[in-house]
Amino acid sequence: MKILRGVSRQMCTSRPEVRVRFAPSPTGFLHLGGLRTALYNFLFSRQRRGVFILRLEDTDQKRLVPGAAEHIEDMLEWAGIPPDESSRRGGDYGPYVQSERLHLYTEAASSLLNTGHAYYCFCSNQRLELLKKEAQRSGHAPRYDNRCRRLQPQQVEQKLAAGVPAVVRFKLHTGTEEFQDLVFGWTGHAVGAVEGDPVILKADGYPTYHLASVVDDHHMRISHVLRGCEWLISSAKHLQLYRALRWTPPTYAHLPLLLNRDGSKLSKRQGDIFLQSFRDRGVLPETLLDLVTHAGSGFSDNRMGRRLDELIRDFNISKITTHSALLDLDKLEEFSRLHLQRRIEDPQQCVWLCEELKQMVKHTHSSEISAAAVLEPEYIERVLQLRKGHISSLQDLLSSTHSYLWVRPRVSQTQLQSESAHAKDIATAVMQMVLAGGSLVSMERLSSELKQISSRTNSTHSSVMKVLRLLLSAQQRGPSVAEMMLSLGEQEVCVRLQKALEL
């Protein structure tokens, strides 16, 4: 590999505008850890009227997953935190895919070679593997010995002319590189004292992360880099690269890791951490945003229930601690109930929920639907208002426990008689009560009138409730009988009670 010489260095430029980026590798689909990083970048940019960029770091071509790039942006849009600039949306600083920016990395590497900050390395994979094994045998961390630093210019030219495969390595200096991180404060790392010179451009012309991220952040005018703390030590290398290229580095903020509740790392092998999995289960996007921010820091208080506009308002980067954030997925149902309730209570959101649930009911129950009325917006909204706080997703209303809402139950005379000898008397008394009007006005009024049925039918209140639950739902458990009746409405309750009298 031969790099053209004589490329001019780009001088530093000012960056008055806040520009942040989420730069995942499309080697997999978006999971909760990536969502959290993207969200913090989004919140930071929105607070400062800045720009949120999606950049795809696809230089590791062997590990690319088909469809992952498109899926990542799909999930950001679904979560309500779409990028302002991306390969899909365009922008003034594209391309937004690293494999389409190779000429920029070649130019930067050439500049570093010309100024003596980088050099060609011709060491074979076999030699590098021997160095690694030798270090391990002696109990040291593997590192490159910088052998090719000492090659004379004539030797380099001869090897390049002979077509010997080469990479480009950056010369690390041994001093401590100090900088102020917005999360970790003043920090410094002497990477040159413990690591060998890193590869910045591979033999195939593709850059490594270190060069690509620096070049892209410069050319895309990134003002702040919010990324995982696993890159904290590498920042020392990046700052040396910025200095060598005479560019102004961005401000760094390294976010603590998002871990499982037991302290273990989130793994892509955990199928339940991918956003698509949550979406398929009917989890609302705002639930996940609230869950991942609640798991860590960045807010003055750790209350649950924040929606996106509240997250933007309350986010404070100075409140992010260096401690790992522990994700408790056992709380997902609680978060889901809260956010679904808030949607139900929002008139505009409730209209959307009603239509969504209608389509779900039609798909699930199709020809079994008891009457066209159960697909009317008024009926579905009534169901949602009565069930809010009890359900964590619309899919809960499609479970067998709630099938009575959409399908009339089948009850046999044997079932009815086994429940109570006064079953038909109970059905008659309740139907008369309903037809008299006024009983289905409120839960309190209905519950009060149902208590009077037991004395009128020589039955216990418990027996009355069991009979009504059977006739209305053919189930032994579920919502209260009063709620069932309010949900179904006067006409449907009477239809189901009349069926019992005809047995």
From Swiss-Prot:
Organism of provenance: Danio rerio
Q: Where does L-glutamate bind?
A: 21-23, 57, 209-213, 227
Return the motif ranges for 'HIGH' region.
26-34
One molecular function GO term is: glutamate-tRNA(Gln) ligase activity
Q: Which CDD domains match?
A: GluRS_core (cd00808)
**Protein name, as recorded:** Nondiscriminating glutamyl-tRNA synthetase EARS2, mitochondrial
Q: Where is the transit peptide?
A: 1-22
The reactions it catalyses are: tRNA(Glx) + L-glutamate + ATP = L-glutamyl-tRNA(Glx) + AMP + diphosphate; tRNA(Glu) + L-glutamate + ATP = L-glutamyl-tRNA(Glu) + AMP + diphosphate; tRNA(Gln) + L-glutamate + ATP = L-glutamyl-tRNA(Gln) + AMP + diphosphate
Q: Where in the cell is it found?
A: Mitochondrion matrix
Q: Does the keyword Nucleotide-binding apply?
A: yes
Q: Domain of life, per the record?
A: Eukaryota
Binding residues for ATP, per the UniProt record? 31, 230, 265-269
The entry's function note states: Non-discriminating glutamyl-tRNA synthetase that catalyzes aminoacylation of both mitochondrial tRNA(Glu) and tRNA(Gln) and participates in RNA aminoacylation for mitochondrial protein translation. Attachs glutamate to tRNA(Glu) or tRNA(Gln) in a two-step reaction: glutamate is first activated by ATP to form Glu-AMP and then transferred to the acceptor end of tRNA(Glu) or tRNA(Gln).
Q: What are the alphabetically sorted keywords of the record?
A: Aminoacyl-tRNA synthetase, ATP-binding, Ligase, Mitochondrion, Nucleotide-binding, Protein biosynthesis, RNA-binding, Transit peptide
Give the location of motif 'KMSKS' region in residue numbers.
Answer: 265-269
